[in-house]
C-alpha cells in the first residue's frame, strides 16, 4: 500500500486550488476525524501496525451571499472502518448508510463525501482514492474527499486537505478549508497538545456496524 501511495502521489501534486468552492469544517467533525485516525496510528502503537481509517462526512451545500462561490458546510463525520487499505464506497456500507440517512433526514443534511487517513504518507489522493472518489462523484457531483495525516498535524498545521475531481474525471482540484467560524483552520487547534499528550492505544472510537 505504501508503494502505491508513493507512486500515485502525482495525481494531486499539481492540483490547483479552487476559487469557486470553500469548505467550512465544523470543529466536531474535524475532531472526530482526528480521534478516529489516532485510534489506529499514534505514538504508542508500533508504526508497522499503523492502519488507515475511513468514514463519511455530511452537511449542506449552499451559495455565499454574493453567489460567487459554493459553501460546503461539513457538520459531521461518521467513522466507518479501518485497515491496511480503505477504498470502500457507499454501496459497501448499506446498513451503515441507512442509519446515517435516518439521522440526516432530521437535519436537512446529506452525505457530502468521505474522509480517510494517510498515516505518515502525506496529503494527496492515491490511485485507489481516485477510483473511490470517482464513484462518489458519479452519485453526487459535489462530493469531496478529506485526507488527514497525523504526522503532519501540529499546532500550526491542520494536517488535512480536501480534494474533488474536475468534470473531466481525470484531474483533481483542492478545495480550501476554513473552520466553521470563518477563521483559518490553523487558528482553530487549541487542543492539539492535549490530543498528543493523551492519545494512546487504549482509545476506542465507535465505528458504525457494517
Question: What positions do the PLM features span?
Answer:
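MPN/JAMM (Mov34/JAB) isopeptidase/deubiquitinase module and associated MPN-bearing subunits/adaptors
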Residues: 1-113, 117-210
